[in-house]
Amino acid sequence: MSELIDDFATIYPFPPKPAALTEGEKAGLRDNIARLLKACNAVIVAHYYTDPEIQALAEATGGCVADSLEMARFGSSHPATTLLVAGVRFMGETAKILSPEKTVLMPTLHAECSLDLGCPEAEFSAFCDAHPDRTVVVYANTSAAVKARADWVVTSSIAVELIDHLDSLGEKIIWAPDRHLGRYVQKQTGADMLCWQSACIVHDEFKTQALRRMKRLYPDAAVLVHPESPQAVVDLADVVGSTSQLIQAAKTLKQQQMIVATDRGIFYKMQQACPEKNLLEAPTAGEGATCRSCAHCPWMAMNGLKAIAAGLERGGVEHDIRVDEAVRQRALVPLDRMLSFAADLKRC
């Protein structure tokens, strides 16, 4: 498999950690948010990697906690006229692409994703132009502009199936932006894939030496790994899968202990799925490495109660997701293909 860049060495300016709130302040904000959601005919669409209190709030107010594929489905089908997307910016853009008639708000427009940042539209478009014989498949963790350049958009939950399908048609692939997920998919399918070389700052921090030590401490534990992790970490896994697939695995596996190599935000829904099991965070390189926050995305952490309340109260340029209409229409094509393909998989 060819590679575009040899090393992933970008250091991103991470946001400051949100200020701590008292329990009284949190209760007041939750009440205010519930009132604002009703007043705005809004619903919260939250990702598994947001903080547990945000996921609980989404559930309590009739919203959704899900992976990026289910977030897209939920937002486009829900009758609310306003979507409050608790996640990172590409998730808000995806919601707007699929639901242009709705107001899409985010707690902050500064919640980034290293995969998105690591795949600028101009450079990626030039790369695609240099390989016109290849089908362009981009991960959901990309900007609207990059999606608009793609033939397909895909999430980790259906990546192997989609690439296997395209490979069966004899198509050669450009894959972007996650290098680890790309390598995993290529290994599973044998497809001819030319991969962009970005990575998730959280999953890139999981290390084999530390994971082996933890496996020795918990020899009966199952190891669950997200495929955005380095290949050597994936090789130590009992189960490799997307967020929703890892939650399902934790529920169905016979082991009572799970070592989980993904963002620790997933533990909220995973523990709901298997309350009797012991969930353990897989070790990372730790604070001081490229991931400041030890298996928790610092941009996901920006989706706090104060920021959600501010988004609903103010809206406007600080919170309102806007996508150029020409870009939106082009990006809608590969997104619709993804949703149709995923629906076909469900029917099989």
From Swiss-Prot:
Gene3D superfamilies the UniProt entry points to: NadA-like
Any one GO cellular component localisation term in the record: cytosol
Primary localization: cytoplasm
Cofactor (UniProt): [4Fe-4S] cluster
The enzyme's E.C. designation: 2.5.1.72
Cofactor note: Binds 1 [4Fe-4S] cluster per subunit.
Protein name: Quinolinate synthase
